[in-house]
Amino acid sequence: MSEKEKSSTTTSSVIDEFGFPAEVIQILDRTGVTGEVTQVRVRVLEGRDKGRILTRNVKGPVRLGDILILRETEREARKLSTKR
């Protein structure tokens, strides 16, 4: 088995076991009753949706450039709206 085949099977097993890696490219806003959730834009790094940009809600501390592991890439967070 060549090095390229080994790395591709390793990558696919990581995706199957854990999820899809995505890099935080923009922090949008805080949401939740007490502001405990941060809405961010992420770029999917591997998998069938490689390069796709999603809006997701993240609980816990997050910074630009962080790598998140997404269990799936189909769902996207709703846009925040102000209620008056």
UniProtKB/Swiss-Prot annotation:
SUPFAM superfamilies: Nucleic acid-binding proteins
Keyword Ribonucleoprotein part of the UniProt annotation: yes
Biological process terms in GO annotation: maturation of SSU-rRNA; ribosomal small subunit assembly; translation
UniProt keywords, alphabetically: Ribonucleoprotein, Ribosomal protein
Any one Pfam family match given in the protein's UniProt record, by short name: Ribosomal_S28e
Origin superkingdom: Archaea
GO cellular component terms listed in the entry, alphabetical order: cytosolic small ribosomal subunit
One GO MF term attached to the UniProt entry: structural constituent of ribosome
CDD domains: S1_S28E
Family: Belongs to the eukaryotic ribosomal protein eS28 family.
Protein name stated in the entry: Small ribosomal subunit protein eS28
Lineage of the organism: Archaea, Thermoproteota, Thermoprotei, Sulfolobales, Sulfolobaceae
Underlying gene: rps28e
